[in-house]
Amino acid sequence: MSGVVLLVLAIILITIFSLIYYTIFFEFDETTFSKRLRVLTEYAKRTNADKPTPDVLGHVSDVYDHTYIVSWFRTNDLSTYHETVHDDTVEVFDFLEQQFSGAQATVTQRVAPVAAELDAFVVTNDAGDVKLRCPQNFSFDYGQLKCVPEDPCSGRPPGRYPMNELLLDTLVHNQHSDKNYSAGAHLYHPTLYLRCLANGSHAVRECPDNYTFDAEAGECRVNELCEGRPDGFVLPYFPEALLVNEFVECRNGEHVVAQCADGQVFDRALMTCVHAHPCAFNGAGHTYITSDIGDTQFFKCLNNHEAQLVTCINRAHGADGQYACSGDARCADLPKGTGQLVHIHTDDTFEYASGQMICDNYEVVSEINCDTGDVLGDKLFINKFKLNVQFPLEVLEFGACAPATLNNVSVLNDTFPIENAPNDYGVNMQTSVVGRTSMVAKLMAGDDPDTAFGENVLLARDVNTVGLNPFTAEPIDCFGAQLYDVMDAHRANVCTESGNDLLKTVEFGDGAFLSVFRDDLTGSDADYKQFCAISYESPLKIVKSDHFQRRILTNILQSDICADLYTTIYQKYTTLARKYTTSPVQYNYTFVKRPENMVVYAKNTRFKNATISEPAFDLFAAQTTDKENGFARSLFDPFADGVWRSEPGGDGDHWAPEVPPTQPEPELEPESETELDSDLELEPEFSPLILNKKDLFYSCFYELPSFKLSSCHAENDVIVDALQQLRASVKVDTECELAKDLHFVLNAYAYTGNNIGCRSVFDGDDVAVVKEPVPSYVFTNLQTQSNDGVRYNKHVHVKDGRYMACPEHLYDDEAFACNAEPDKLYYLENMQQ
């Protein structure tokens, strides 16, 4: 029992000793020890004549610009005592005095590299500049402000290189010794070698078993296998390039490749040549090569008598002697599958390196893929424009990914296409506006996106052309069968169906406008005089002028909608009952506004807002009787001699004098007042219809007129009263109950969903909101009454599932009410239908 205890105790002691030993061994830093020894030696040389060596010695061990570290170590064993961090703008360290003192002057740069000497650098101390050198096999890295090991592949082309003692210490043992390696520089490791890759990186490789690295040839060679063996001895050695009819045998103490007789193959199991198919003895899955196939091909047995030819990117030979495909297809274009492949992205506008791949023997050993995601993304500018260009977040620069800028991205074209979001009018603006690459720099600098966009675009109107080629920015006449610019809609081009030849250019003057849904692109409106034209010169202001409204005060024309509606209403509300006799003269004509200013006065009529306090005639004077209708004549008639008249279908206003009767009218016997009351009721007097002014509201999508709202002024009491009655007695179809408030504006339309379209109409008798048999328009967005989410019609309002038509300036959104003017009639027209 005592012997076992002693054995266990001995094992424990040995283990403890081993742990302590290896701890000391692995923690020992030979480089640090050498540095401290030199520091101690230098201090002793310069001070031992005056003072003894201190127990703890400090020295500046690291410098980071104005920050430096003082390392303190014990002088008896050179072990670490402690470290302190200091700022040289505050205090400096005196090595000989071993103490700190206040900084006397500010030094802008403490450490600087030496351009011609990679291992040297200059340190500026309090006494001046001192040139220092890194240890051998080190170079100074100014970016890290320290000495770093030299790159083992620096100055070497890609390939295989032998491993000397220096490479073994630094790459295998990870030790950077300060010793001199020149004595054993010609000695190399027998199987390890250095593989330098195309990108300057490196890897340590080892030859297979029974192979030795040939330093001169730079490749692994098989060891001699025939030492002490007779000639003709067949070796169980099957190198990768050995054909199916070949084998290796010994001759004169060396191994050579021999061949079987014609028609024979070498059976590696029997170790002899045989007359048989290569698959006969090995079966399915066996692989072999012949002299008539390529270096990347091999045969694979399907059964005992059939084989298929397999073609690879790279043919590999496994430890089991079988062939297999290996390698990455991406390395196939590199010589011998080895080298560096930089990925270059090229489009119509930019070119940049997006990454790189390093291949070694058809295998990818390293790969860098930068984040080339579009930094602009799917961002919309001014809520409708998208840049049809990709600018990466990162690019490859100096072998690493770096933020993309116009300095590391090549500009191939100064302009790029711009797309616009789909709209209800099908307007494609890619020929109207193109982007300038200067926009990208502004966006990358953090400028306001919309401002950067608007200030860096080229407009077709700027170069006086109908359209621009989206990719080259050159002026064009055709881009498909039709070409127009909604930002400059005073003309349009009609081209052949192929879009190659221009047929004609349509100019839009007064009364005409661009109508995108018509084959001839021409719409007509007598009131329209290019009111949607944009007068800005700044591209930023132009591209922002996507939706606006123009208001125009003008005259009611004889043939416009105001005249038609008011004439119909006037006739309805001034038509007498059968017991009255219709006056053929006064009510068969309508007073209208001439092209020039003209005032038409009503016949002896007192308006509701009249302020005349004295009578214009004697009410009790004897009245004369009109022979034509039997009614008493007016005592005051300013139109007794003539009247301005405009007949429906006539050619304007003209003066029509009254024709005197050819013979005197016989006087009628006076009748008693009682008889007049009982036999004849007098026809009531109505104020004449005066058609004078109207307000027009044109909604514009850029220079494309979309909706026209006519606000017809009523200057007649009959019309004002009629409007009040019509609005108070609106008829509504059951399906259009939610849209009943469309009645404020005639011809207003709203789609309420479920295939129901409602429209406000005047049928000659009443105002009604009716359901259309087939909806004129079906909208996916009920709130905006559009399909693209844009509210083009500013006069139709939607709130809480209810629909109202009201001039935009009269609409009360909070109360969902229309403050319609009592003396105005509103009519809405879709100009792009």
Swiss-Prot record:
Its main location: virion. It holds the Pfam family CBM_14. Residues 647-673 are annotated as: Disordered. Gene3D superfamilies: Chitin binding domain. One of its GO terms (molecular function) is zinc ion binding. A zinc finger (C2HC BV-type) spans 147-196. Residues 1-18 form the signal peptide. It is found in: Virion. The keyword Transmembrane does not apply. Disulfide bonds join 207-220, 260-273. Keywords: Chitin-binding, Disulfide bond, Glycoprotein, Metal-binding, Repeat, Signal, Virion, Zinc, Zinc-finger. Glycans are attached at residues 137, 180, 199, 210, 408, 413, 588, 609. It comes from the Viruses. SMART domains: ChtBD2. GO terms for cellular component: extracellular region; virion component. Residues 223-281 form the Chitin-binding type-2 domain. Probable capsid-associated protein. This is Capsid-associated protein Vp91. It comes from Choristoneura fumiferana nuclear polyhedrosis virus (CfMNPV). The lineage of its organism: Viruses, Viruses incertae sedis, Naldaviricetes, Lefavirales, Baculoviridae.
